[in-house]
C-alpha cells in the first residue's frame, strides 16, 4: 500500500468529499474525514463504530472472508452494502439525488491492504478503481473508503495482505476478528450535534402554528404558546412539512416527514492465520491414514483368500 502521510490522506478525502458536495466539507456525506478528525480510533470500547453517531438509522451490511489464510498471502474481503438502488436521498441543496456509500474495515494488527504488485490480476479486476485510505498513520490496519456512487460500489472487494509471523513477532498463528462498518446515504447529525436536512424536525414547544413561511433555503414555522410567546423553527430545504397553519402541536411533535432513506450497519467475522507447518503435518497425517487404510484392505483380502483356500482344502 502507498505510504501516504496523514495530511495528504486527509486532503485526499476532503477533495473527494468536495466532489460530492455542493457545500464542501460542511456536507454530512463527507463522513470519512469527520470520523478521522474527531476520533483517534473508529471503534469504541463498547464495540460501536463511531460512524453511527452521525448516521442514526440502522441498516444491514455483510462481509465475507476465507475461513483461514496462510501468512504473506493476499485474500479477498468482500463487503456488501445492500439497498434499493432506485431510492433517492435528500442532498444538501434540498434536491433529490442518488445515494453514496462508504465503509470502514478494521483489520487485525499486522493485516493491511495488499500492495498493487501483490494483487493477482483476477482479484484486481474485482477491486476495480477503489481507493483505500488508512484511517491514520497510527492505525494502518484500519481502512476507509468513500463516499462512492452506491449503484456501482454497493459491493466492494478489499485485497488484504496477511502478515507473516516469521518477520513480524507481534503476529501469531491465531483466530482474529475483523470488524466492518458500512453506510449508505447521508447522515442525520453533524459532529457538533446539529441536525442535517436529512432528518426529522420537531416542534421546539407546544403551541399553535400561526404561520408557515417557505423560502429558497429555509422554511420558517412560527408557533404561539399558551403564554402568548412566539417561537420560530427554521427548517432547511429537504424534508416535507406535514403540519398546517392553525394546527395545535405538542412539544417534540414532528413538523416534517423523515426524509432519510439510508442507514449505517455493523458486522464482524473471523479469519484464522494458519501455520503452513500445521497444514503440511495434517496432509502427512492424512496420507499415513490413507496408506494404513489401503494396507488394511489388502491384508483383509489376503486373509479372505487364505480362508477360502482352507475351506476348499
Curated annotation (Swiss-Prot):
One Gene Ontology CC term in the entry: chloroplast thylakoid membrane
Membrane-protein topology: Single-pass membrane protein
Binding residues annotated for heme, in chain numbering: 31, 51, 54-55
Signal peptide: 1-30
Cofactor: heme
The keyword Isomerase is annotated on this UniProt entry: no
Subcellular location: Plastid, Chloroplast thylakoid membrane
Keywords attached to this entry: Chloroplast, Electron transport, Heme, Iron, Membrane, Metal-binding, Photosynthesis, Plastid, Signal, Thylakoid, Transmembrane, Transmembrane helix, Transport
Pfam families, per database record: Apocytochr_F_C (PF01333), Apocytochr_F_N (PF16639)
GO terms classed as biological process: photosynthesis
Cofactor note: Binds 1 heme group covalently.
HAMAP family from the UniProt entry: Cytb6_f_cytF (MF_00610)
Family: Belongs to the cytochrome f family.
PANTHER family referenced in this protein's UniProt entry, alphabetically: CYTOCHROME F (PTHR33288:SF10), PTHR33288
Main function: Component of the cytochrome b6-f complex, which mediates electron transfer between photosystem II (PSII) and photosystem I (PSI), cyclic electron flow around PSI, and state transitions.
Subunit structure: The 4 large subunits of the cytochrome b6-f complex are cytochrome b6, subunit IV (17 kDa polypeptide, petD), cytochrome f and the Rieske protein, while the 4 small subunits are PetG, PetL, PetM and PetN. The complex functions as a dimer.
Protein name: Cytochrome f
Organism in which the protein naturally occurs: Nephroselmis olivacea
Amino acid at each position: 500500500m502507498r505510504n501516504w502521510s496523514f495530511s495528504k490522506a486527509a486532503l485526499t478525502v476532503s477533495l473527494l468529499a468536495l466532489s460530492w458536495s455542493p457545500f464542501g466539507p460542511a456536507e454530512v456525506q463527507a463522513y470519512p474525514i469527520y470520523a478521522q478528525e474527531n476520533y483517534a480510533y473508529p471503534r469504541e470500547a463498547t464495540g460501536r463504530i463511531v460512524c453511527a453517531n452521525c448516521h442514526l438509522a440502522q441498516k444491514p451490511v455483510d462481509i465475507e472472508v476465507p475461513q483461514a489464510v496462510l501468512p504473506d498471502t493476499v485474500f479477498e474481503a468482500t463487503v456488501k452494502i445492500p439497498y434499493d438502488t432506485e431510492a433517492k436521498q435528500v442532498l444538501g441543496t434540498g434536491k433529490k439525488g442518488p445515494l453514496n456509500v462508504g465503509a470502514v474495515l478494521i483489520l487485525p494488527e499486522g493485516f493491511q491492504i495488499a500492495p498493487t504488485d501483490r494483487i493477482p490480476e483476477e482479484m484486481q479486476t474485482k477491486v476495480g478503481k477503489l481507493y483505500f485510505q488508512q484511517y491514520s498513520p497510527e492505525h494502518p490496519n484500519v481502512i476507509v473508503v468513500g463516499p462512492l456512487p452506491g449503484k456501482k460500489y454497493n459491493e466492494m472487494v478489499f485485497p488484504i495482505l496477511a502478515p507473516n509471523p516469521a518477520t513480524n513477532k507481534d503476529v501469531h498463528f491465531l483466530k482474529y476478528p475483523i470488524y466492518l462498518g458500512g453506510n449508505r446515504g447521508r447522515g442525520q447529525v453533524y459532529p457538533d450535534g446539529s441536525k442535517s436536512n436529512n432528518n426529522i424536525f420537531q416542534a421546539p414547544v407546544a403551541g399553535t402554528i400561526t404561520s408557515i413561511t417557505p423560502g429558497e433555503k429555509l422554511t420558517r414555522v412560527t408557533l404561539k404558546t399558551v403564554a402568548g410567546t412566539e417561537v420560530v423553527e427554521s427548517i432547511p430545504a429537504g424534508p416535507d412539512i406535514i403540519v398546517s397553519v392553525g394546527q395545535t402541536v405538542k412539544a417534540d411533535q414532528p413538523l416534517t416527514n423523515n426524509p432519510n432513506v439510508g442507514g449505517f450497519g455493523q458486522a464482524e467475522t473471523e479469519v484464522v492465520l494458519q501455520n503452513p507447518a500445521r497444514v503440511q503435518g495434517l496432509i502427512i497425517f492424512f496420507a499415513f491414514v490413507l496408506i494404513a487404510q489401503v494396507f488394511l484392505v489388502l491384508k483383509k483380502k489376503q486373509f479372505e483368500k487364505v480362508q477360502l483356500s482352507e475351506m476348499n482344502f
